[in-house]
Amino acid sequence: MNEDKLESKWLFSLTESQKLYLLISLIINKKLPEAKFVYKLLDYTKGNWLSLLLRFLPETTDPECYIPYIDIDSHYGNIKASVNDIEPIVLPDEELCQLRLTNMKLWNCKLPSLKDEAEFYSLFSKKIVEETDLVDLAYQLTKNSQAPAEIQQWNSGTFTVFHKLSQFAAVPINLEEMEAATIRDVISLAFPVLDSKNCVFIMDEIITVFINNSSNDPNLISENWDFVWKKLLQLVKTDGLAVVHTLVLNWNTIEPKLFLKLAKVALASCYISDDSSLYSVSLARDITEAIQNKLNFSDVNFGDLLKKPHDFSADGLLSLQNDLTTPSSLSTSLLMEITKAIALLTQLKVPAPTFKTSVSISCSNFDSQIKYLENVLLNALGTIQSPDYKDWHDLYSYIERFKQLSLFFLNISEDAISVVFLKQMLQEKSFLALKQMRNEIGLKDIEPKVLIDCLKTSFYENFRAASNMNKNRGKLALACKVLDVFVDCEPTIDLRRRLNSLVNACSLIQPFKLILEPGKPLSPSLVEANLNPDKLIKTIFSQNPSAYTLYDDILALDIELHKAAGDFDYSQVFTELRRITEHMITLTIDVSLEKDDIEYAKQIVEDRLMTLAEASEDVKFFLYEIAYKIGKFPSNHPNAKVIRLDMLQIAIANAPRQKLDEVVSYWTDFQSNSKVLEENLNTTDVEFHSSKKIKDYEDLEDANFDEEWSKAADLMSDDPENQVLYEGNLNSSLSLNEDPSVSDENLTQKVTSKLTNGLGWVLGVPPRK
């Protein structure tokens, strides 16, 4: 390639292609005065000039540098006076210039041409924005005074909006696009970058300007603003309340009518937001206070707003019929109370509900509010391992404050709240704290049926989980504590007595190690499932051979079993105790006699039954029956004779008049028969006697007692040791070692003497001398 170095008048010697190539080079290098001079040397149109500027002028060029040269025919722009003022430029030769121009499609073809300057302004401003994102340069181009009228008008409206918006977001625009832009286009560009720092500027300088310049139709303007508010509400759902908070507090140039709309959006924003953090709550409180101050609202009773459900959709919240978001003293008062309630829940370390949820709970029915209260308590206690009185007291105080706020628990009475606390404290096994708070939560004022249900539920929760039978340990001890909580609650007295006796029975039955069901260890639940007093006592006697000797323990157990089974009339305590005692004495003596332990049977009569007989005339007949039964029992016990005689004398002493002859007759015959037996035993070898003792008694049992006792009567002795019968010493025994003597004394006289003196003991008459 050959290049020519031009001299001082080199320009006029250039070929057409070299001049065009030079013109392009000058435009590219932003040398517009020189370019305008060269253009004058070429036979090109104004449209060609504008086309070359559009194509080759760098987009980053300061508009002030080329604006004077856009109108090539105007007097604006400094044209060099002479060719000498143009510095020589080294250009390619003609052939090379033509080749390069051909590649740029500027040679051997029709040059591109723009229609007019307005087209250049539009296209070059678009090119600036698309290539550099420097919208401000395009804005400077279109706002200058030399721009065509249509460009200036467009710049003052639509392009101003996009120019201002370009500070925050990329704005790909051209004249056609800007002219066709709608509020949707502006919002789609503006809202993604909207934040608390730029929201006032964007809403005031961009959104408002665009809507006002886009139409003069009031209906269209209203529709555009409705779209803005709806999109702003959607933005809150994803980005939070910060933007709305800033707008309400700092958008001071907003028109009063628009502020009412903004206030509605702000109130709706609080309900549509899913964030209930302290930060969001503080923003909501600021928003509400600002609306109250600017619109002169006051705090009022908002109860009417919570009497019906509300639509929390975006359209529902922005509806003119929605009283919840329509700016008023009612709506702002409610929102302020919700902020206080959420703050209280946050202090309790409870997950705070959203504003929407708070209203929904407050409008809900009794069951829903109870469930929410239970969740509040559970969450509040979630971080406390063993809540004490202070924890429960503070929690109860918080709930009372909620009631004062008229939120959440509107349909729950004080008693219902007390019941929830009662159940939860029982569940947490905070028995000591519950006893301390009985008056505070009004335990005694709770409905009786509810009290009983709570008692049963909590008691059996622990009782049926118990494996240990000791009432002072484990789950059984907890069951006792449940009963202790309700000690002052009169409606529960019958149930408490029965359940307390059930616990006592479990503890008393433990030492006997019963097997109630094969393969199952003894447990409180098993005792309850087999709660039949007679059956249990008999099972103890059958599985524990010596259990009948533990009379006091068995009696105590039997009493508790009857109480636990509901077979005990507390209005007649002494009657019931006597009934159970008589039954137990009968059962114990029956078992004793079955085991031929007549001595223990005698002990029961003397130590237990006679004491009862002294205190009650009604027991004497029972004493007679028992003593007579023992007296007639054919025992093989070594002291059987003495014991039986003692028992027969006790029977005589307590027999009713109609039974007295029978007992006396039996006692007389038995005593006489005993003398014959004594004589026979003394004439027999001792060892033989010992080995045959049981057989002899069996033979005696089968013999004719009347005949034997008649023979024995002849052998009755007047031994002084027999006088113990008449001295009234109930703890002494007749000796079996008396020596029988034969006397000529009339048998009738002796029997009469014995009988008379025996009755004397019964009647308190001294014996005959």
Swiss-Prot record:
Cited Pfam families: Sec39
Q: How does it sit in the membrane?
A: Peripheral membrane protein
- A GO biological process held by the record: intracellular protein transport
The cross-references to InterPro entries, in alphabetical order and at most eight, read: Sec39_domain
The UniProt entry's GO CC annotations, sorted and at most eight, read: Dsl1/NZR complex; endoplasmic reticulum membrane; nucleus
- Keywords on this record? Endoplasmic reticulum, ER-Golgi transport, Membrane, Protein transport, Transport
Give the UniProt subcellular location, in the record's own words: Endoplasmic reticulum membrane
This protein's source sits in the domain of life called Eukaryota
Give the matching PANTHER family. PROTEIN TRANSPORT PROTEIN SEC39, SECRETED PROTEIN
UniProt family annotation: Belongs to the SEC39 family.
Indicate the quaternary assembly.
Component of a peripheral membrane protein complex consisting of dsl1, sec39 and tip20.
Q: Its function?
A: Required for protein transport between the Golgi and the endoplasmic reticulum. May contribute to tethering of coatomer-coated retrograde transport vesicles to the ER membrane through interaction with and stabilization of the SNARE complex.
Q: What is the protein named?
A: Protein transport protein sec39
The source organism is Schizosaccharomyces pombe (strain 972 / ATCC 24843) (Fission yeast)
The gene it comes from is sec39
